[in-house]
Amino acid sequence: MYAENYKIFEAIIDKLREFDGAIIVEGPRDEISLRKLGVRAEIIKLSRLPLAEVALIASQYKEVMILTDLDRKGEELAKKLAMYLEGYGCKVDTETRRSLKMIAKKDIKGIEDLYNLYLRVSLRFWPPEEGI
């Protein structure tokens, strides 16, 4: 990860920690990674339920963040989920996933790798230099 992306990455992690809705991930390792980062939001895993059922459960929250993996399969899942959730009238956050993909796709394959990336870049860019 480049130094100029570090601040953006840090802001994404802060946003995840402060998020007050439900976060949809693909599997249990994704949830573990987010919990290690200090995320307290409700986390709904796709691995055990059909998409329509996940969307129905998530639709009970004011806002839903979709954090599927950063690969093609994750992209397809995110689009389908967003369509279902918008049909329920949910406010859907796909921008966080898009931002992560833009700055970290070369560094991680999926959400399960997020915590390890956070540790690596935190060590690399600590202490913060002026202008970073």
UniProtKB/Swiss-Prot annotation:
This is UPF0292 protein PYRAB04740. InterPro entries: TOPRIM_dom, TOPRIM_RNase_M5-like, UPF0292. Gene3D superfamilies: 3.40.1360.10. Keywords: Magnesium, Metal-binding. Mg(2+) 2 binds at residues 69, 71. One of its GO terms (molecular function) is metal ion binding. Its cofactor is Mg(2+). Mg(2+) 1 binds at residues 26, 69. Residues 20-100 form the Toprim domain. Binds two Mg(2+) per subunit. Belongs to the UPF0292 family. It comes from the Archaea. SUPFAM superfamilies: Toprim domain (SSF110455). Disulfide bonds: none annotated.
